[in-house]
Regions:
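Acidic, proline/glycine-rich low-complexity IDRs
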Residues: 1-172
Length: 172
């Protein structure tokens, strides 16, 4: 999973709360778990279609993001081994940009600003996901093999492994 839940005593009852991802602070919660479960279900579905096991990530861990990636229609997400601390190992970049300016933000900021990218954040280190118009169009594993592509917008992988225009799996 990507988040944690807390139990709160409210008027003599125990309620399950999730973090309030829309707030600036990581400490506030809300008395529901719907947002967390929706993201978790999407992540599990994505991993299942790729036949990949989940790798731990938490909503309050950090991701390095290039400023252009927040608004770009083409986005590349890739994960390296975490250097430790609160870093998840994830990077989010606009592959067409020449800037190398990155900012470190908590993963819940991705949930707020680009929620469509949340599905891929439980992939293990070494994986790369290329997004086109907000949807995954190609996934590469840690051996640089294309394990999924939609055939419409996926770029050619540096090491090959796929046939442009031919999907290996059904669309995600």
């Amino acid at each position: 999973g990507w988040t944690t839940f807390s139990l709160q005593a409210v008027r003599g009852r125990i309620e399950v709360w999730e973090p309030n991802y829309e707030q600036e602070t990581e400490r506030l919660g809300r008395p529901e778990i719907s947002a967390s479960l929706i993201v978790d279900a999407a992540q599990r579905s994505f991993l299942s279609k790729l036949s990949v096991d989940s790798f731990e990530v938490q909503y309050d861990q950090h991701i390095l993001v290039s400023s252009e990636a927040w608004e770009a229609s083409e986005v590349m997400l890739f994960r390296v081994e975490s250097p430790g601390g609160r870093m998840s190992g994830w990077r989010m970049v606009d592959p067409r940009s020449e800037t190398d300016t990155m900012e470190s933000v908590p993963l819940y900021e991705v949930y707020r600003r680009r929620p469509e990218f949340m599905v891929s954040l439980t992939l293990p280190p070494g994986y790369l996901v290329y997004y086109h118009a907000g949807a995954p169009s190609m996934v590469m594993d840690s051996a640089d093999h294309i394990i999924w592509e939609d055939g419409t917008a996926a770029p050619l992988a540096p090491t090959g492994g796929g046939t442009p225009g031919v999907a290996k799996l059904p669309p995600l």
